[in-house]
A protein has these predicted regions:
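A short, Lys/Arg-rich alpha-helix, primarily the initiator
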Residues: 1-15
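DNA-binding alpha-helical recognition surfaces that contact promoter or target DNA
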Residues: 7, 11, 25, 36
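Residues within the helices of the helix-turn-helix
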Residues: 10, 21, 50
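The alpha-helix within a helix-turn-helix
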Residues: 13, 24, 53
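Short alpha-helical DNA-recognition segment
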Residues: 16-35, 66
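Recognition helix of helix-turn-helix/homeodomain-like DNA-binding domains
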Residues: 28-44, 51
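DNA major-groove recognition helix of helix-turn-helix/homeodomain DNA-binding modules
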Residues: 47-65
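Short, charged recognition helix plus adjacent turn
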Residues: 62-80
């Protein structure tokens, strides 16, 4: 099933009982930037994939989904 990077990250946060700020700290970005990425307004940094995999101990299926979501987000970012 296809999900966007924003939905993937939000689901991951909820599963770990975190707020946007908590994930932003782990990713070493501001909450505002993380929000922009989640909403498709900014592209995710290339290093996020490995940081998220390590910080959240993703399953193999989650790693595949994350990779696909990040690639899709890099290709489809909307600028307003």
């Amino acid at each position: 099933m296809y999900i966007s990077l924003g939905r993937f990250l939000k689901k991951l946060r909820l599963e770990n009982e975190e707020h946007l700020y908590d994930m932003a700290v782990k990713l070493k970005v501001s909450s505002a930037f993380l929000s922009k990425v989640e909403n498709g307004k900014s592209k995710p940094p290339t290093k996020w994939e490995s940081i998220i995999e390590n910080e959240y101990k993703l399953t193999d299926d989650q790693k595949v989904d994350l990779c696909r979501c990040i690639q899709e987000a890099r290709n489809n970012t909307t600028i307003n």
